[in-house]
Amino acid sequence: MKEFITKHRDKFQKISAISGAGISAESGIPTFRGSEGLWKNFRAEDLATPQAFSKNPKLVWEWYLWRRNIIETKRPNPGHFALVELERIHPDFFLITQNVDGLHSQAGSKKLTEIHGNIFINRCISCGQESKETISENTTPLPPQCQNCNSFLRPGVVWFGESYDDFKLNFSIQRMKHTDLLLVLGTSGSVSMPVYLAQIAKDSGALLVEINPERSSFSSSVDLFLQGKTGEVLPELIREILDNPS
């Protein structure tokens, strides 16, 4: 790690990070994939789609409220706070997260885009109005309705088969094109978007550093692979970067 930083210290002008489910898992949040994602024998892929919502919006909302309840009991971990510290000290840093749990914001990240949305946002399917009003199965008929136009509300996340928000996507692409150092944190590459963004960064000349407990689809193309949990390895990496300013 030290040799890598010393050799490439002039590459630390513009630093970006992509975070995935691994950093949230360190806070105790299930990945909601595979066996962890099963709820009443439904898989995430069965419920997180426009078709599922159109067919049974009440069922989809019940699943998302179950997920919200789990996430609300969790707190940011050292990996989240290390990114906040990097943002505070480094003048040109930006974070792109796949995670919808809001823990990066809760930790204090400001230069952040939640490319898959935020599970605590409610968005109207007709007028697009968004809110963070608390929804409870005990007090709110499901699916909840928009106060502006009375259409159904849906969770403000990107579902399987949906397009990404144009502004968030275009901003992320431009950021990758002008990034010197990209940190890939806790994402396996099973979702195509982070792989796509990382490839843009690499093709544009960025150095790639991956932190993951196990090797992933990114590992063969990164410049440095650091095995371990983000919350354990990232603080050490950031200390090295900040101790060796460019």
From Swiss-Prot:
Matching InterPro entries: DHS-like_NAD/FAD-binding_dom, NAD-dep_sirtuin_deacylases, Sirtuin, Sirtuin_cat_small_dom_sf, Sirtuin_class_III, Ssirtuin_cat_dom
Recorded GO CC terms: cytoplasm
Alphabetically ordered keywords of this record: Cytoplasm, Metal-binding, NAD, Transferase, Zinc
Chain positions recorded as substrate binding sites: 64, 67
Catalytic residues identified in the record: 116
Residues annotated as binding Zn(2+): 124, 127, 146, 149
PROSITE patterns, alphabetized: SIRTUIN
Deacetylase sirtuin-type domain: residues covered: 1-245
Subcellular location field: Cytoplasm
Superkingdom of this protein's organism: Bacteria
Cofactor note: Binds 1 zinc ion per subunit.
HAMAP family: Sirtuin_ClassIII (MF_01121)
Family stated for the protein in its record: Belongs to the sirtuin family. Class III subfamily.
Comment field on protein domains: 2 residues (Tyr-64 and Arg-67) present in a large hydrophobic pocket are probably involved in substrate specificity. They are important for desuccinylation activity, but dispensable for deacetylation activity.
Function (record text): NAD-dependent lysine deacetylase and desuccinylase that specifically removes acetyl and succinyl groups on target proteins. Modulates the activities of several proteins which are inactive in their acylated form.
Designated name of the protein: NAD-dependent protein deacylase
